[in-house]
Amino acid sequence: MTSALYSGLSGVLAFSRKIAVSAHNLANVNTDGFKKQRAVLEEAAPQGVRVRVETIEAAGPRTLELTEAGETLVEKSNVDIAEETADLLLARRFFEASLKAIETENERLGTLLDVLE
């Protein structure tokens, strides 16, 4: 596999994971006590990217709720919908760019094979 194809595929896989992590966070935005995750991209040799997922332990907002036992302080999730939406949009753009890199390299290799025939 050429380095350009490897790089593009690595990007597609990495940004797929970032999108999945943001989707997981958004799906749990209303889950009390949920701690959001962050997908951190790291360089991987040669010319690749790997993803490390970490949990953000920051406390979510606390609200006073009425339960059968009386008033209880409940910690909500620490997910910020605006931040997750922005992360999703950015990851999507990088995902598309990685796909384009694969497409471009595929076309280049096709042209090279045509010349060699």
Named regions from a protein language model:
Residues 1-117:
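Amphipathic alpha-helical polymerization modules
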